[in-house]
């Protein structure tokens, strides 16, 4: 979604305001792609791609010059300027601009759609519906969106009968909570209260955190309309969604409503509600209330009682009270054998022993876990950590046995590459010189952390690693044109690169072969849709990229969007642009409008509070959360942050760990584990997510450098520096 820099001068209210945010997808649609659009300057293209605040003024200036000279690109520039006014929240000005120039036939539906948006935001719903309906016959993606918006506009105009068939048509094509809410509203207006209730029920169960569900719930509670009847299981399902998203207060309110509505009728239900209530209280730092709730849960059925004890054990771990936590875990293992919680308790007993340096105890506990829980999905992890305990303990034979068992028993596990690397590493630690084995790792897994480690181990042994990728990634100039891409290409040549990307993405599901993926992915990349090209390549082009070393496939898997700005920003902050791209690849897969479940936003997945803290350090106004979707702002703030992390932590593995888990946690780990070599340090970090994150970011950092950097490759330091005592702390 393209963020607006400020609200519309005529701000829509209620549901219309929600639709304003949902409908801004057109905001920066009219951006030229390369030489196909000759009316816009390269400077304007860059500004629009990065969503710079100056893009509107630049577009208006170029339009004025074009109009004065009578150039042919005035209609395209007018549409661009109008769309930018719309995204800035100035619908009246946008309407004036959009009506100044007719559009060529191909662009007419997109101009009509933008005019419809402008009318909608100034609350002229009948005019909006008429404009949207002019776009409903267009070929491609815009037609479905126009149908949806026409239905919503007619609904706002009081024409529920005309709106309903359009909304139903759009719901079938697009789905989503907004259209469910609109259909419920239309059905209610037409007297179909049962249908409206069914839609609201689906909305609240399937999309509990959507703004549409939140608004509908609030409106129902504030009116005389009958509330949506949810079962206890549905209420508890919603509660878990809110807890997972960090909305503990909302979760508590949901539990309160379960009790108020008389859904909690037996001891088992009371125990389930109490267990969830305890988790919400802990999240709100209300420990005393949480303990009271856990006492109720502990008196419930065995499965709930075991989960309650597990929640208490996790809380003790968070407080670093490991001895008490271990006692609780041991009690779960003995008292509740066979319950799901006992599996997690047994696993954590082995894992905690490893974290505390009780290496032989850890190895024995983890091997026991594999035997005790033969159906567990964690058996491969337990096997690897058993091997890790033996490696740290210097028991090379036992380490090799565990690693061999991992390869043999769990051959389809994603831990096999690291098992193979560590078997070779164990051979070296035992006194061998496994040059050929390391070279095999490099050939098998060239794009991974373990391929990078194998390179460095070869150099450590005095060997020169054979180059794996011999050709720089580049988009193919030999990709054949495809008939199915005729419309996207025509849109791109008209300057509608975002719409071209929409059309290309709509075709992704029909791409099933590497050859087609290369053709469509290249077209995506050429119109600036790096994230869509990457996702397609990630699904179908691994063989071409890593087995065949095809530079065209590698270019799609390792793109460099916004390259001039990324390079400039990286230089300003004293970091390698390769590191920024590696973080971007992991965080958002190059998707500028990505929003995570934790509410992190944009290319580098910045949290609003982190962005505000960075802005304060830079003496800038804190950005609105939705402003973080702007690539330029997101990159500027995150590059400064990465630069500060680099000053404090130096090593890319530590920088990546701090970006993911935070500086304080990373400092704690370096204090406890920092004497280890980097491979062992990364495997020993307590957070599973951070281990995976660091491995990918470090590998991608060095691959980007090898692909696009200078002639001399950077080396990965195998020992970790001591972090600076002072530096960034958030």
Predicted feature descriptions by range:
Residues 65-74, 98-109, 132-145, 169-179, ...:
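Short solvent-exposed coil/turn linkers within tandem alpha-helical repeat scaffolds
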Residues 36-83, 87, 96, 110, ...:
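N-terminal leader/linker segments that initiate helical-solenoid repeat arrays
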Residues 319-324, 330, 344-361, 366, ...:
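Catalytic glycan-binding domains that act on GlcNAc-containing polysaccharides
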């Amino acid at each position: 979604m393209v963020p607006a820099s400020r609200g519309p001068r005529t701000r829509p209210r209620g549901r219309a305001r929600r639709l304003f945010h949902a409908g801004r997808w057109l905001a920066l649609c009219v951006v030229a792609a390369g030489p196909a659009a000759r009316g816009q300057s390269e400077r304007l293209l860059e500004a629009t791609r990065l969503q710079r605040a100056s893009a509107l003024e630049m577009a208006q200036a170029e339009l004025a010059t074009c109009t004065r000279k009578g150039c042919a690109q005035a209609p395209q520039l007018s549409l661009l300027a109008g769309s930018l006014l719309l995204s800035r929240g100035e619908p009246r000005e946008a309407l004036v601009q959009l009506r100044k120039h007719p559009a060529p036939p191909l662009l007419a539906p997109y101009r009509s759609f933008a005019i419809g948006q402008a009318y909608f935001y100034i609350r002229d719903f009948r005019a909006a519906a008429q404009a949207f309906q002019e776009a409903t016959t267009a070929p491609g993606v815009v037609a479905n969106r126009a149908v949806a918006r026409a239905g919503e506009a007619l609904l706002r105009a009081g024409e529920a009968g005309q709106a309903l068939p359009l909304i139903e048509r759009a719901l079938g094509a697009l789905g989503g909570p907004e259209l469910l809410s609109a259909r419920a509203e239309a059905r209610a207006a037409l007297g179909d209260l049962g249908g409206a209730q069914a839609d609201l029920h689906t909305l609240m169960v399937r999309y509990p955190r959507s703004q549409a569900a939140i608004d509908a719930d609030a409106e129902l509670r504030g009116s005389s309309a009958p509330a949506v009847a949810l079962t206890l299981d549905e209420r508890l399902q919603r509660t878990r969604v809110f807890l997972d998203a960090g909305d503990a207060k909302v979760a508590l309110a949901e539990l309160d409503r379960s009790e108020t509505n008389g859904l909690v009728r037996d001891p088992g239900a009371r125990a389930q509600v109490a267990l969830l209530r305890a988790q919400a209280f802990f999240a709100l730092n209300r420990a005393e209330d949480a303990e009271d709730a856990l006492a109720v849960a502990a008196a419930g059925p065995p499965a709930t009682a075991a989960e309650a004890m597990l929640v208490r054990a996790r809380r003790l771990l968070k407080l670093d009270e490991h001895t008490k936590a271990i006692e609780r875990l041991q009690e779960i293992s003995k008292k509740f054998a066979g319950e799901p919680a006992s599996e997690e308790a047994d696993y954590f007993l082995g894992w905690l022993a490893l974290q505390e340096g009780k290496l032989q105890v850890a190895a024995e506990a983890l091997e026991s876990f594999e035997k005790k829980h033969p159906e567990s999905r964690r058996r491969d992890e337990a096997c690897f950590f058993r091997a890790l305990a033996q490696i740290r303990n210097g028991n090379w034979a036992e380490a090799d046995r565990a690693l061999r068992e991992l390869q043999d028993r769990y051959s389809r596990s994603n831990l096999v590459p690291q098992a193979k690397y560590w078997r070779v590493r164990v051979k070296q630690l035992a006194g061998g010189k496994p040059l050929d084995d390391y070279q095999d790792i490099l050939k098998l897994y060239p794009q991974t952390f373990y391929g990078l480690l194998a390179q460095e181990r070869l150099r450590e042994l005095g060997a020169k690693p054979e180059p794996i990728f011999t050709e720089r990634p580049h988009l193919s100039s030999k990709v054949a044109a495809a008939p199915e891409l005729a419309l996207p290409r025509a849109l791109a040549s008209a300057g509608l690169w975002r719409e071209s990307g929409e059309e290309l993405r709509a075709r992704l599901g029909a791409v099933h072969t590497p050859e087609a993926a290369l053709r469509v992915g290249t077209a995506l990349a050429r119109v600036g849709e790096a994230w869509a090209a990457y996702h397609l390549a990630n699904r179908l082009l691994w063989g071409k990229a890593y087995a065949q070393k095809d530079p065209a496939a590698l270019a799609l898997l390792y793109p460099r969007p916004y390259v001039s700005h990324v390079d400039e920003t990286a230089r300003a902050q004293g970091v390698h642009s390769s590191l920024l791209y590696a973080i971007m690849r992991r965080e958002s897969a190059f998707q500028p409008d990505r929003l995570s479940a934790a509410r992190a936003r944009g290319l580098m997945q910045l949290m609003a509070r982190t962005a505000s803290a960075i802005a304060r350090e830079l003496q800038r106004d804190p950005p609105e959360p939705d402003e973080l979707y702007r690539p330029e702002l997101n990159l500027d703030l995150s590059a400064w942050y990465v630069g500060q992390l680099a000053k404090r932590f130096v090593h890319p593995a530590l920088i990546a760990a701090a970006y993911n888990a935070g500086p304080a946690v990373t400092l704690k780990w370096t204090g406890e584990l920092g004497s280890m070599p980097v491979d062992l340090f990364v495997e020993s970090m307590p957070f599973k997510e951070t281990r995976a994150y660091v491995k990918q970011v470090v590998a991608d950092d060095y691959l980007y450098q090898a692909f696009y950097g200078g002639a001399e490759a950077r080396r990965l330091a195998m020992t970790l520096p001591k972090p600076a005592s002072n530096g960034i702390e958030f």
